[in-house]
Amino acid sequence: MILKNVKLKSGEITVPGDKSLSHRSVLFAALCKGKSKVTGFLEAEDPLNTMSAFTKLGLKVRKVKPGEYEFESPGKRGFISPNVDLDFGNAGTGIRLSAGLLCGLPGVNAVLTGDGSLKKRPMGRIIKPLTAMGASILGLGEKETAPLKVEGKKLKSFRYESPIASAQIKSCLMLAAIASETDLEYSENILSRDHTENMFRFLGNKIEQISPFHFKIEPPYVLNGGEFKVPGDISSAAFFLVLGVLAKEGNLLVRNIGLNPARIGILKALELMGAKIEIRNQRMECGEPVGDLKTYPSILNKTNIPKSLIPSIIDEIPILSVAGLFAKGGFEIRHAEELRAKESDRIHTMVSNFRALGIEVEEYPDGYAFDGTSPQSLEIWKFLASGKKISILSHMDHRITMSFLIFKTLSGFNLHIDETSWIETSFPGFEKLLESCLDE
């Protein structure tokens, strides 16, 4: 266990808009013929790349002010084949969901690509079910990776049992069915994020819920323009929740955060560890639950993270693991093999960086465990506390970078993180906001 070493200014903060909802607001605005509006849009590289891709297909975009955009779409029958590749940068959500949508647009042909990191991420998980729907989609990279070549066509009715709980697979197939005006019946073994379903309902559509993890949609679909309000991203708030509960003094009130039941696993996991976090001012906006979160300095302990929580905390596991460094008894995460398919292999990345800190970590195919109190780690921590520098490798991963910036702040250790520019993919202004929270 590492000692806490930071005091906070008690006050209110806001974090950027939800990344998942920002991507989806562009996709539904594109599907809806006519005008739509979004407020609270995350102006970070990933969703902006999705927006840029659809402008090349015929979507008109006007920025009203920071975070607020107006869209005018020709509708799904009015899109054109772009004369350039659609570059999604590092946006795995953007490329997978857009691939599904474009597969269902007859006559629209496109190549979807991204940066070096994105080209390593698995695409077979969407290619296989889309192909079974009748789609024409090829992974041009090794092992069915991006670039993706799509030739839009009319798709057939489809029933799919997903082998993994994945909101990206589910949303990809939903958007393919919606674009192609066809039926989809979908089931999964654990409930994944349901932002796409909520936005779909918000537009006036019905979903037949066969069981908690099994649903069906069928045309005709209602695709009229609307106003989408994007709340703050709980995955971004998670960094400041951990900062708040591990501070020696001070409270943070993080305002206007999306509290979708499939996303609040981070709150449940932190509470299982002993964190005190209060939910205030709960309300509904555009089909999504929203509220404010207040943190209190807490004493954390090792706990068992239930398998059922893993899909809802998959993006927050790096920062949750950092919290584990300050917990009595250490930390263990299992059933999280999906971490290996993120922006980096997050299991290996976290393990290697923890080992650089001198922590004895047991790596598993689906996670890792550490107690944090070995003689070797205690010697290294004394070494770090004396001001000696140690290097942390980000592996081009924004969440790894931000997690270790929080660790550096809490511990006071002189860490050097090789590159912090990756933060721009999801949280512009992160370091400035972090600095503003500290009571010097």
From Swiss-Prot:
3-phosphoshikimate binds at K19, S20, R24, S166, Q168, D315, K342. The lineage of its organism: Bacteria, Pseudomonadati, Spirochaetota, Spirochaetia, Leptospirales. One of its GO terms (molecular function) is 3-phosphoshikimate 1-carboxyvinyltransferase activity. It comes from Leptospira borgpetersenii serovar Hardjo-bovis (strain JB197). It comes from the Bacteria. Monomer. It is found in: Cytoplasm. Phosphoenolpyruvate binds at K19, G92, R121, Q168, R346, R399. It is an enzyme of class 2 (transferase). Catalyzes the transfer of the enolpyruvyl moiety of phosphoenolpyruvate (PEP) to the 5-hydroxyl of shikimate-3-phosphate (S3P) to produce enolpyruvyl shikimate-3-phosphate and inorganic phosphate. Its EC number is 2.5.1.19. Pathway: Metabolic intermediate biosynthesis; chorismate biosynthesis; chorismate from D-erythrose 4-phosphate and phosphoenolpyruvate: step 6/7. Pfam families: EPSP_synthase. GO terms for biological process: amino acid biosynthetic process; aromatic amino acid family biosynthetic process; chorismate biosynthetic process. It catalyses: 3-phosphoshikimate + phosphoenolpyruvate = 5-O-(1-carboxyvinyl)-3-phosphoshikimate + phosphate. This is 3-phosphoshikimate 1-carboxyvinyltransferase. Its main location: cytoplasm.
